[in-house]
């Protein structure tokens, strides 16, 4: 099941009722209102726009809307609760059922959190095994390791970000989010020694290509039965012999198991010690 840390949905303006106009930025063209925009950056990103000119409702939010259930990320099971949580804020009332049926997904961050003890070591190994540095550009953006497909055409662009999720949560910008949780420590413990792989798909065509779908309905996107993160890694990493971390890996977990073995010099006792050291109590 696909899991997302961000989703953007476009639907009909008929599916929103603005309750508190004072919480929206009202945009005019001459004397006519053309849109209402609600933007929230903390404790989680939320953007709601009622575009009168285009008769569209635009909703964008991140997985932190799930609060204590954030580890589950946005998925097919909890997407309705995510939208209902927007209604609980009190600035607008969304017709959740119609949005889920008739909305179109136009942007997503496909996400996978994987247990691994050393994010820095893992990203070094991934970078060392990139097959073509002209085609795939590794770089550091906002303190995170990224690999981007170096193409001009937007529909073919793809960016994968790899970072230590526990460290990211402890940054100052997440202080308000953590303060509103029922059990902050439980969430931090969950993300201890977790490496996050996050693929940014910022256009309809990118989503179609990465998820192997033609229909961009909410259900179609969240029901996609593929792992685009692994497929991207499979494209960018070199073919290697049996001792290389990328050799004959069937899925992302196998890749990380191989990386752990390589870090521990293929010594099973060292592997077991690392797992005990970084396992949650």
Question: What are these model-predicted stretches?
Answer:
Residues 1-278:
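Structured, helix-rich domain cores that form ligand/interaction pockets
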Residues 281:
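Helix-turn-helix DNA-binding segment
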């Amino acid at each position: 099941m696909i899991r997302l840390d961000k989703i953007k949905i476009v639907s009909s303006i008929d599916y929103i009722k603005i309750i508190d106009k004072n919480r929206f930025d009202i945009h005019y063209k001459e004397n006519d209102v053309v849109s209402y925009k609600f933007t929230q950056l903390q404790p989680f990103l939320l953007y709601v726009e009622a575009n009168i000119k285009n008769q569209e409702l635009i909703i964008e939010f991140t997985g932190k809307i799930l609060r204590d259930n954030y580890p589950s990320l946005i998925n097919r099971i909890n997407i309705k609760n995510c939208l209902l949580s927007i209604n609980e804020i009190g600035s607008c009332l969304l017709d959740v059922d119609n949005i889920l049926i008739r909305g179109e997904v136009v942007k997503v961050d496909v996400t996978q959190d994987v247990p691994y003890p050393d994010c820095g070591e893992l990203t070094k190994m991934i970078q060392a095994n990139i097959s073509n540095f002209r085609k795939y550009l590794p770089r550091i953006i906002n303190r995170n390791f990224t690999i981007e497909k170096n193409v001009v055409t937007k529909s073919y662009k793809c960016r994968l970000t790899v970072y230590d999720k526990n460290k990211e949560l402890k940054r100052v910008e997440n202080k308000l989010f953590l303060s509103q949780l029922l059990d902050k420590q439980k969430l931090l413990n969950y993300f201890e020694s977790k490496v996050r792989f996050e693929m940014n798909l910022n256009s309809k065509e990118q989503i179609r290509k990465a998820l192997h779908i033609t229909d961009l309905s909410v259900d179609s996107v969240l029901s996609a039965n593929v792992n685009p993160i692994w497929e991207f890694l499979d494209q960018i990493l070199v073919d290697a012999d049996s001792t290389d971390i990328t050799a004959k890996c069937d899925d992302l977990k196998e890749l990380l198991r191989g990386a752990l073995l390589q870090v521990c010099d293929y010594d099973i006792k060292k592997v077991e010690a690392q797992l005990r050291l970084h396992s949650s109590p």
